[in-house]
Amino acid sequence: MPMPKIADARALSDEELSQEIYAVKKELFELRLQQATRQLNQPHLIRLRKHKLAQLLTVESERKRGKSLSSTQTQKEE
C-alpha cells in the first residue's frame, strides 16, 4: 500500500477534509487499540495512517493560514 499523496488531500473540500481527519483519527485509535491487545497483524498501517493524518492537518492549517493572511492583507490595504 503506497503512501498517500498530499495532492489528494488538497483536492478535498473543507467539509470533506474535516470528515476525513475525523475518520483517520478514529481508525488510528482502533489500530492502536489492536496493537495494545496484540491483535494487529499489519503494524505498517499505523505509520500510513499517521502520515495521512499529518498531511490532512497540514492542508487544514494551510487553508486557515491562507484565509487569515488574505484577511489581514485586505485590512492593511485599506
Curated annotation (Swiss-Prot):
One of its GO terms (biological process) is translation. Keywords: Ribonucleoprotein, Ribosomal protein. CDD domains: Ribosomal_L29_HIP. Residues 59-78 are annotated as: Disordered. Residues 68-78 have a biased composition (Polar residues). The keyword Ribosomal protein applies. Pfam families: Ribosomal_L29. Disulfide bonds: none annotated. GO terms for molecular function: structural constituent of ribosome. Belongs to the universal ribosomal protein uL29 family. PANTHER family: 60S RIBOSOMAL PROTEIN L35/50S RIBOSOMAL PROTEIN L29, LARGE RIBOSOMAL SUBUNIT PROTEIN UL29C. This is Large ribosomal subunit protein uL29. It comes from Synechococcus sp. (strain JA-3-3Ab) (Cyanobacteria bacterium Yellowstone A-Prime). The gene is rpmC.
